């Protein structure tokens, strides 16, 4: 149950009530139970100032350093309960956030401090910098308590964005201060690592053609409001957003053995040591003209996608839980995929989409389960338009799998 009350042009009140019957929903956090208030906020907006007290949803850049969001279908509400102030001055925009993060029906023990500053040089060019701090006291109960404990983890981001008439460029560099790693749900007293992220997205688009290239390197880039929630399956307490940079499909067989990003450090097995990911995605689109050799009588749309993501390369030590990483070298392959998508109108009433996917998925390394899966997927999707308001769609899908 959600209620929004707009008092006037400047004041807005919002609240949301959630209720769950006994027994956890599939893939929902078991902390979501009974009846509770999940959102409560008051917002004031004037010409240059935007103030919020209560539940805060926001994102810095593309979310690599900070994102507080809600997705009801997945049972996710990672809002910050606190204070948010935004204001503009000439070409500068400032956004500040402080508070505790919502975790199920409670709030985090870690305190969150964040600021984002955007400077717009030109209409098409701007620079941004962000800071996110998580302050959580660590209570080591054993006698090997470290002497150099810093309860605050700091993340700093620098971003450059350019959007032209035919060319665009977005780049981001993030540094993360040293932080203790959680293993098996317990915070390690001897395993603390720094982290970083490097991101580049660039592309070109014109009439009938488009190119897009994305590169990303992640090293120990997960950040949680509570350290003991590290790498939990429900995304409870996560402060940033790191999706897989691979092509998304509408077809059921194409959504088997899909890749999930690997930003975490893991020493669960001597053969499965990980410290992050490095990889890229390239996409090419072209509109094949009518009456051309490839376009035929009615023309066609061709899309080619290539993606490849690997473990970070370097020297790992399982006994010491340490590593010395190479910056740009690629380690073991997590996931690779090449796909071709052809959309063809045969007439005004009938069209087809032809999809071919060649995929490799290292299930053993990504999920710590058995198998290195090689797949080939073929899809033929047909649409027949009966009239302006009615159509019939039928598709054929086939999956060739090995080692799954």
Regions found by a protein language model. Name each.
Residues 149-404:
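Exposed, low-structure sequence patches enriched in small/polar residues
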Residues 70-72, 78-83, 124-125, 189, ...:
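Short, surface-exposed, polar/charged, turn-prone segments marking secondary-structure boundaries
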Residues 24, 28-32, 68-70, 75-77, ...:
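General N-terminal targeting signals
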Residues 18-26, 49, 56-71, 92, ...:
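Sequence/structural signature of outer-membrane beta-barrel proteins
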């Amino acid at each position: 149950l959600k209620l929004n009350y707009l008092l006037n042009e400047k004041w807005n009140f919002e609240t949301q009530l959630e209720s769950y019957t006994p027994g956890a929903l599939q893939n929902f956090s078991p902390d979501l139970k009974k009846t509770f208030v999940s959102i409560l906020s008051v917002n004031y907006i004037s010409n240059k100032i935007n103030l919020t007290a209560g539940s805060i949803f926001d994102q810095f850049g593309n979310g690599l350093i900070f994102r507080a969001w809600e997705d009801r279908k997945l049972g996710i509400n990672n809002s910050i309960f606190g204070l948010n102030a935004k204001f503009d001055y000439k070409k500068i925009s400032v956004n500040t956030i402080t508070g505790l993060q919502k975790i199920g029906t409670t709030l985090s023990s870690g305190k969150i401090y964040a600021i984002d500053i955007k400077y717009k040089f030109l209409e098409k060019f701007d620079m941004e910098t962000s800071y996110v701090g998580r302050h959580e006291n660590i209570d080591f109960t054993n006698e090997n308590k470290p002497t150099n404990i810093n309860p605050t983890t700091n993340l700093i981001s620098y971003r450059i964005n350019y959007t032209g008439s035919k060319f665009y460029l977005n780049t981001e560099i993030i540094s993360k201060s040293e932080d203790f790693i959680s293993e098996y749900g317990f915070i390690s007293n001897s395993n603390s690592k720094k982290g970083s992220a490097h991101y580049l997205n660039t592309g070109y688009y014109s009439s009938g053609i488009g190119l897009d290239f994305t590169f990303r390197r992640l090293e120990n880039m997960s950040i949680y409001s509570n350290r003991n929630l590290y790498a939990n399956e429900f995304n409870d307490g996560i402060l940033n957003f790191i999706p897989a940079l691979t092509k998304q499909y509408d077809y059921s067989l194409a959504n088997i053995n899909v890749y999930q990003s690997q930003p975490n450090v893991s020493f669960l097995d001597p053969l499965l040591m990980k410290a992050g990911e490095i990889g890229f995605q390239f996409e090419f689109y072209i509109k094949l003209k009518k009456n051309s050799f490839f376009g035929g009588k009615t023309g066609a749309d061709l899309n080619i996608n290539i993606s490849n993501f690997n473990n970070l390369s370097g020297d790992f030590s399982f006994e010491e839980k340490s590593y010395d990483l190479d910056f740009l070298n690629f380690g073991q392959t997590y996931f690779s995929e090449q796909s071709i998508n052809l959309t063809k109108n045969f007439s005004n009433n009938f069209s087809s989409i032809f999809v071919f996917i060649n995929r490799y998925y290292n299930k053993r390394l990504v999920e710590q389960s058995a198998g290195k899966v090689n797949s080939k997927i073929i899809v033929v999707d047909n649409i027949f338009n009966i009239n302006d308001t009615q159509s019939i769609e039928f598709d054929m899908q086939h999956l060739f799998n090995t080692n799954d």
